[in-house]
């Protein structure tokens, strides 16, 4: 058995994110969150507000693919025994509904991903991950766990959190990118 990451379109059509197969769920999860984060990643030098492109119809998911070699043919089998043809081999794909929480990722990201419906698109996942990161940054500054050189950005963070709270219910999201100088 191996894992692959697919974009899932509203008509249930699947598109492979990349031509790579993962042998463990952790590697597949790492890659999936990388693709979610890169949906709209501002340039590191950018300091003005930026938007995530919410014109997105596809969601993303990790799928398990069970492969059995029988009669010199590559056959994949799931519980439903449905066949999907892909090139020269037969693939049957079953969705992994829950992604296990591990120590390698902040718990809130998994909590958010785990509690969203399956059809949540990539832009919404990206937005929610960024909101959680911003809220965590605000808490770090309020608890004085953030480096002092960023203390001048407290006003920017308060402004950013207000923007997040205002825009959570509409179809775009604004984030302020911090200067590292």
Swiss-Prot record:
The organism of origin for this protein: Acanthamoeba polyphaga mimivirus (APMV)
Protein's recorded name: Uncharacterized protein R744
């Amino acid at each position: 058995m191996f894992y692959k990451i697919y974009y899932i379109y509203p008509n249930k059509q699947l598109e492979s994110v990349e031509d790579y197969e993962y042998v463990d769920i952790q590697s597949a999860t790492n890659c999936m969150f990388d693709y979610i984060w890169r949906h709209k990643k501002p340039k590191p030098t950018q300091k003005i507000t930026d938007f995530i492109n919410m014109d997105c119809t596809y969601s993303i998911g990790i799928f398990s693919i069970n492969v059995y070699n029988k009669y010199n043919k590559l056959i994949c089998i799931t519980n439903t025994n449905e066949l999907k043809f892909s090139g020269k081999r037969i693939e049957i794909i079953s969705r992994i509904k829950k992604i296990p929480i591990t120590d390698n990722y902040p718990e809130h990201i998994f909590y958010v991903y785990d509690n969203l419906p399956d059809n949540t698109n990539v832009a919404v996942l990206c937005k929610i991950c960024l909101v959680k990161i911003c809220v965590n940054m605000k808490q770090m500054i309020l608890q004085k766990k953030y480096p002092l050189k960023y203390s001048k950005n407290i006003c920017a963070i308060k402004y950013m959190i207000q923007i997040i709270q205002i825009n959570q219910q509409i179809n775009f999201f604004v984030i302020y990118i911090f200067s590292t100088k």
